[in-house]
């Protein structure tokens, strides 16, 4: 995969070399390049922003340096791939979006600053992505989150290919509780089933606990989840347990 990033602060992406992304680069699974689009300004002051027409607070990123930087990337690579604009008004980023992006050969991220963008920049964009209902100073942190979540899904990036498939959200549910040695720590014991060596029972326990955790913490994820008969039975059990606790408090 090739990832291009347009940013006014390329040094902010240094930490990526210390992470899973860095390992992907070392393995030649990923080629990542950061371009400072200030280098493509045509004014003497090297300004990349200007006041908005019609008045208003703040400054807007100009279209010209972004367009010229994108043209340069396209000339070098033959294409831009999917061009992603980090924007609070964009599509909310989640695991399904990461999985979608991980199937692409080329991604280009535009990281903005200031009050916003000249609207004409959006004409070059294929995807607008938001991390949530909040505003960051710039798009760099958002881009790093999207890149990390996407790159770890590429084949052979993680040491164990099952690591990504077993993550929270990958199966539509939160991840089940996990334990390591010792089996008893300050009176807190590892569930006996995990010590049994019975892989079928362990798999069933994990599935049930994954569903339980999702039911308790992120019930919204279950709205589009397709339940098996066994899972429906577990849900009824969770409901009964919930009712008992509520009435017990009363």
UniProtKB/Swiss-Prot annotation:
<keyword id="KW-0489">Methyltransferase</keyword>
<comment type="similarity">
    <text>Belongs to the RNA methyltransferase TrmD family.</text>
</comment>
<feature type="binding site">
    <location>
        <begin position="131"/>
        <end position="136"/>
    </location>
    <ligand>
        <name>S-adenosyl-L-methionine</name>
    </ligand>
</feature>
<dbReference type="GO" id="GO:0005829">
    <property type="term" value="C:cytosol"/>
</dbReference>
<keyword id="KW-0963">Cytoplasm</keyword>
<comment type="function">
    <text>Specifically methylates guanosine-37 in various tRNAs.</text>
</comment>
<dbReference type="GO" id="GO:0002939">
    <property type="term" value="P:tRNA N1-guanine methylation"/>
</dbReference>
<dbReference type="InterPro" id="IPR002649">
    <property type="entry name" value="tRNA_m1G_MeTrfase_TrmD"/>
</dbReference>
<dbReference type="InterPro" id="IPR016009">
    <property type="entry name" value="tRNA_MeTrfase_TRMD/TRM10"/>
</dbReference>
<keyword id="KW-0949">S-adenosyl-L-methionine</keyword>
<protein>
    <recommendedName>
        <fullName>tRNA (guanine-N(1)-)-methyltransferase</fullName>
        <ecNumber>2.1.1.228</ecNumber>
    </recommendedName>
</protein>
<dbReference type="Pfam" id="PF01746">
    <property type="entry name" value="tRNA_m1G_MT"/>
</dbReference>
<keyword id="KW-0808">Transferase</keyword>
<comment type="subunit">
    <text>Homodimer.</text>
</comment>
<dbReference type="InterPro" id="IPR029026">
    <property type="entry name" value="tRNA_m1G_MTases_N"/>
</dbReference>
<feature type="binding site">
    <location>
        <position position="112"/>
    </location>
    <ligand>
        <name>S-adenosyl-L-methionine</name>
    </ligand>
</feature>
<dbReference type="InterPro" id="IPR029028">
    <property type="entry name" value="Alpha/beta_knot_MTases"/>
</dbReference>
<dbReference type="GO" id="GO:0052906">
    <property type="term" value="F:tRNA (guanine(37)-N1)-methyltransferase activity"/>
</dbReference>
<keyword id="KW-0819">tRNA processing</keyword>
<dbReference type="InterPro" id="IPR023148">
    <property type="entry name" value="tRNA_m1G_MeTrfase_C_sf"/>
</dbReference>
